[in-house]
């Protein structure tokens, strides 16, 4: 062997060659793929670190819907490294951002088929899988491309489902049949699966009354180990709650999204929620409403038997002069004053003042620690909340407000807010995560 190919003697090496393994691993952990490959050429020890399982447990691959040459190269590199070090992978996240034509969805489908096939052969450690916002009901997904992707994912979950602990398919937008096909793969050749966290929010397409599907109810009966469940209200039925009751010992959290375009007129019995609350003694339910603001609709959904921890009401800037929030704030939400901990309100109430109703609601909910409000309010509302906090009538830890106004100039309101802040500065800095601004809505 000639001199140039001989290993460098220890006394000739840089001090970086003797960096402790723990420190060296952290250095590599923060490097991107390209820099890692370059660092691996420094010396034998650094090359060996490249094969440390610690570096490859977590992986995120982002596919752009409008890729540049640089981004395409980065994706190819990321996929190559996942295939090479896939045996160490424990947490995989895949993002596909707004594809604009069928060529890109086809390329994504082919890439994912190869990636999932490779992992199913080499990996036995994967604990979590996240593939969000695919929106498979869009026209850019040709039927053949969509079917091929669903088949690849289903085959992968059949092999990996017995070890998978976390699955996030938020925003997939599937038919009931397609969605159940994928979820059924988790319990292939078994009557149950070990998933503890399942996110199927916006998993099904808009306008689907999933709560009427016997297939969906049968599929959900195979989840015996759920701790956390995210889904839409158009999936909720008495039968689903009954299934959850049968395996309720582990259930802790249900996050429910209710969108105006999703069917939400089904009748759920309060006794079904009450039974689930008795079986799952630590259960907390969080509701997220989008453009569902009418009292009659909310009252059908927010039953007093539900152990509600959090409520989010968002109108998304839509205004309905015929819709009043007063009954909701006065009669409905106080029903949950003993359990409600987080409240988010974003609505266009230009036609009615709600300062007094909101203030009374806050001081009546004794466990409320998080309050976020975007609405037409008087600036004095902020001082009333801070005064109540000082007098221990409420126990907020987070207070965020965007005060809408129809005025173009907000100098006067800004000045008043500054005076309020100075007056309660000690309270704010010691007790609150505080953010309040005036926002002009023209």
Swiss-Prot record:
- Looking at the record's lineage, which domain of life comes first? Eukaryota
The cross-references to Pfam families, in alphabetical order and at most eight, read:
F-box-like (PF12937)
Q: Sorted alphabetically, which InterPro entries does this protein's record hold?
A: F-box-like_dom_sf (IPR036047), F-box_dom (IPR001810), FBXO31/39 (IPR045048), Leu-rich_rpt (IPR001611), LRR_dom_sf (IPR032675)
Q: Where is the F-box domain?
A: 16-61
* Transcription regulation in keyword set: no
Q: Which UniProt keywords apply?
A: Ubl conjugation pathway
**The UniProt record lists the keyword Transport:** no
GO CC terms of this entry: SCF ubiquitin ligase complex
PROSITE patterns listed in its UniProt record: LRR
- Swiss-Prot/TrEMBL GO biological process terms: SCF-dependent proteasomal ubiquitin-dependent protein catabolic process
Task: Tell me the function of this protein.
Answer: Substrate-recognition component of the SCF (SKP1-CUL1-F-box protein)-type E3 ubiquitin ligase complex.
**Complexes and interactors:** Directly interacts with SKP1 and CUL1.
Q: What is this protein called?
A: F-box only protein 39
Q: Which species is the source of this protein?
A: Homo sapiens (Human)
Gene, per the UniProt record: FBXO39
């Amino acid at each position: 062997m000639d001199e140039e190919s001989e290993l460098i003697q220890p006394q000739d090496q840089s001090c970086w060659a003797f960096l402790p393994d723990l420190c060296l691993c952290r250095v590599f952990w923060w490097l991107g793929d390209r820099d890692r490959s370059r660092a691996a050429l420094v010396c034998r020890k650094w090359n060996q670190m490249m094969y440390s399982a610690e570096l490859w447990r977590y992986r995120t691959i982002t596919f752009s819907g409008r890729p540049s040459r640089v981004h395409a190269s980065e994706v190819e590199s990321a996929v190559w490294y996942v295939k090479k070090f896939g045996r160490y992978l424990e947490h995989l996240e895949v993002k596909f951002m707004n594809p604009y034509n069928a060529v890109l969805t086809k390329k994504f489908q082919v890439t994912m088929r190869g990636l999932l096939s490779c992992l199913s052969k080499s990996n036995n450690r994967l604990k979590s899988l996240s593939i969000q916002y695919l929106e498979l009901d869009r026209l850019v997904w040709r039927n053949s491309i969509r079917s091929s992707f669903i088949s690849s994912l289903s085959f992968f979950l059949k092999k990996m489902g017995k070890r998978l602990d976390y699955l996030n398919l938020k925003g997939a937008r599937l038919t009931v049949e397609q969605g159940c096909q994928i979820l059924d793969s988790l319990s292939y050749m078994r009557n149950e699966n070990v998933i503890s966290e399942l996110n199927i929010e916006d998993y099904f397409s808009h306008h689907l009354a999933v709560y009427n599907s016997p297939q969906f109810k049968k599929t959900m009966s195979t989840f015996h180990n759920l701790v956390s469940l995210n889904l839409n209200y158009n999936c909720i039925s008495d039968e689903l709650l009954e299934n959850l009751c049968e395996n309720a010992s582990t259930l802790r959290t249900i996050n429910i999204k209710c969108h105006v375009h999703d069917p939400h007129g089904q009748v759920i019995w309060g006794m079904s929620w009450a039974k689930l609350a008795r079986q799952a003694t630590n259960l907390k339910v969080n509701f997220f409403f989008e453009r569902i603001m009418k009292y009659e609709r909310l009252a059908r959904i927010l039953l007093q038997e539900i152990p509600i921890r959090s409520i989010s009401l968002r109108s998304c800037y839509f205004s309905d002069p015929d819709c009043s929030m007063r009954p909701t704030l006065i009669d409905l939400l106080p029903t949950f004053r003993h359990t409600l901990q987080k409240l988010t309100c974003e609505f266009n109430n230009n036609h009615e003042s709600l300062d007094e109703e909101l203030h009374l609601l806050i001081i009546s909910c004794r466990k409320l620690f998080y309050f976020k409000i975007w609405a037409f309010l008087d600036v004095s509302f902020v001082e009333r909340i801070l005064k109540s906090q000082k007098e221990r009538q409420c126990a907020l830890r987070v207070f965020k407000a965007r005060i809408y106004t129809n005025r173009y100039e907000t100098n006067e309101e800004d000045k008043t807010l500054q005076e309020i802040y100075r007056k309660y500065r000690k309270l704010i800095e010691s007790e609150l995560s505080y953010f309040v601004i005036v926002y002009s809505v023209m």
